[in-house]
């Protein structure tokens, strides 16, 4: 009788612990939705500040020089550069962790899902780039062809929550997978096409350090401090190489261990035995007053950590700082453009503006939905349950929200072209708002007809 009671209590303890473990996709969606709210708030502040009587103080703040010196060595950069070249590396590191998880255990782990997502994402990148290039062919502004390729995952999922009751949950997972592949494409574009002069020595040093991390992962090294120190050195070498340092963030993330040190079956056995031992020794379950129980609880914690993966732990640890701090700071430093009727008119008349607006709205729509139709027609891939081509058309409009990544690419491509950069940022905002509204209206219309 007592044994049955202990077994029941043990199961209850384990059940309560397991109830705290949520599905990775659910956690990802919730984090991205929260991120969209903070991003929106920071964007509104930046726009208000840049268009108010305090606009001069805004420009002074983002161009404030910060740094330190030791003897003759001096490291100094503007606040905007610190955010774009430093803090955003952490965002891209988190992005790399998410990409690795999706490839190993997420939507991209299954071949049939992977084929459809890759085909749709390729269409959603190539078509906008071609449309932009058509408007800017042989012009200096042609360098901005990568701007309309990107999708802002946080804003896209945030917008989708407005119609979440009217769309299949599998559509949200589809867009998450689509955005992940899209991010991979954007990262490759940044690494290959938005790199100026390359220092081969520094680039080889960065590659060697990242390769060393990969070997360490294979050898079973799991200490966070080790990966942090070598990772910072790789970031510095990448920064000096001429390749944008955010590329280092992604590649370092791919070396982070994704396998647990302790199999889940063994961890459950050990946890059960420890809980049973605690129950057998004493009825006093007070951890504070009972040193033995305290030590046993620490053992359970140690086993639990060994049963989880460094990749998931670090992803969870970075999620909140990126959502609450890094992405809003990026929006605050980069979204402050002067907007008025004349700036919107200039955007729709300028080749850069025409290329970005057409690329994000029409390019994403034609590219993603067209690629999906092609894949279905020739049986190359399949859609998730309850998702049809009409849903994909709505999703392709939502994918035209390119705020964060598009703005980031615009700052790389037009860093020394003030007019083009201003038009690009204004056009990204305008196109993102328009395509979000169109996507919401279309998905709502489709749901009423279903």
UniProtKB/Swiss-Prot annotation:
Entry-linked InterPro entries: Na/H_antiporter_dom_sf, NhaA
GO biological process: regulation of pH
General function of this protein: Na(+)/H(+) antiporter that extrudes sodium in exchange for external protons.
Reactions catalysed, as given in the entry: Na(+)(in) + 2 H(+)(out) = Na(+)(out) + 2 H(+)(in)
UniProt record similarity statement: Belongs to the NhaA Na(+)/H(+) (TC 2.A.33) antiporter family.
Protein's UniProt keywords contain Cell membrane: yes
Membrane topology: Multi-pass membrane protein
Residue spans crossing the bilayer: 35-55, 79-99, 117-137, 143-163, 173-193, 198-218, 224-244, 320-340, 356-376, 392-412, 423-443
Identification of the protein by name: Na(+)/H(+) antiporter NhaA 1
GO molecular function: sodium:proton antiporter activity
Alphabetical UniProt keywords: Antiport, Cell inner membrane, Cell membrane, Ion transport, Membrane, Sodium, Sodium transport, Transmembrane, Transmembrane helix, Transport
Subcellular location: Cell inner membrane
Database matches in Pfam families: Na_H_antiport_1
Cellular-component GO terms for this entry: plasma membrane
């Amino acid at each position: 009788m007592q044994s049955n009671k202990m077994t029941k209590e043990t199961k209850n303890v384990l059940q309560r612990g397991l109830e705290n473990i949520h599905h990775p996709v659910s956690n990802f969606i919730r984090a991205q939705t929260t991120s969209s709210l903070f991003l929106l708030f920071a964007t509104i502040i930046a726009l208000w500040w840049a268009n108010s009587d305090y606009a001069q103080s805004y420009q002074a703040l983002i161009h404030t020089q910060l740094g330190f010196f030791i003897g003759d060595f001096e490291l100094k950069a503007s606040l905007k550069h610190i955010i774009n070249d430093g803090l955003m590396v952490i965002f891209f590191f988190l992005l790399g962790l998410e990409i690795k998880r999706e490839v190993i255990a997420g939507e991209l782990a299954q071949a049939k899902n992977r084929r459809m997502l890759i085909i749709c994402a390729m269409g959603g990148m190539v078509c906008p780039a071609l449309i932009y290039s058509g408007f800017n062919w042989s012009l200096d502004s042609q360098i901005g062809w990568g701007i309309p390729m990107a999708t802002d995952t946080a804003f896209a999922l945030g917008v989708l929550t407005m119609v979440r009751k009217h769309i299949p949950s599998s559509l949200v997972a589809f867009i998450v997978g689509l955005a992940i592949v899209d991010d991979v494409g954007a990262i490759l574009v940044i690494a290959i096409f938005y790199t100026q002069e390359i220092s081969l020595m520094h680039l080889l040093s960065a590659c060697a350090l990242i390769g060393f991390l990969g070997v360490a992962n294979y050898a079973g090294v799991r200490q966070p401090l080790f990966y942090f120190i070598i990772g910072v050195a790789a970031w510095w070498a990448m920064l000096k190489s001429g390749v944008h340092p955010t590329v280092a963030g992604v590649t370092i993330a791919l070396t982070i261990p994704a396998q647990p040190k302790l199999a889940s079956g063994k961890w459950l056995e050990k946890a059960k035995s420890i809980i049973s031992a605690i129950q057998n020794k004493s009825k006093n379950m007070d951890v504070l007053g009972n040193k033995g129980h305290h030590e046993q609880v620490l053992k359970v914690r140690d086993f639990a950590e060994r049963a989880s993966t460094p990749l998931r732990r670090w992803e969870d640890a970075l999620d909140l700082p990126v959502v609450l701090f890094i992405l809003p700071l990026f929006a605050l430093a980069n979204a402050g453009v002067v907007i008025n009727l004349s700036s919107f008119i200039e955007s729709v008349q300028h080749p850069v503006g025409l290329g970005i607006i057409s690329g994000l709205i029409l390019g994403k729509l034609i590219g993603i939905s067209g690629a999906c139709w092609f894949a279905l027609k020739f049986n190359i891939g399949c859609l998730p349950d309850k998702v049809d081509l009409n849903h994909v058309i709505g999703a392709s409009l939502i994918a035209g929200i390119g705020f964060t990544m598009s703005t980031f690419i615009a700052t790389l491509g037009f860093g020394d072209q003030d007019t083009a950069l201003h038009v690009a940022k204004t056009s990204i905002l305008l196109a993102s708002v328009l395509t979000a509204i169109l996507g919401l209206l279309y998905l709502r219309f489709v749901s009423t007809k279903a």
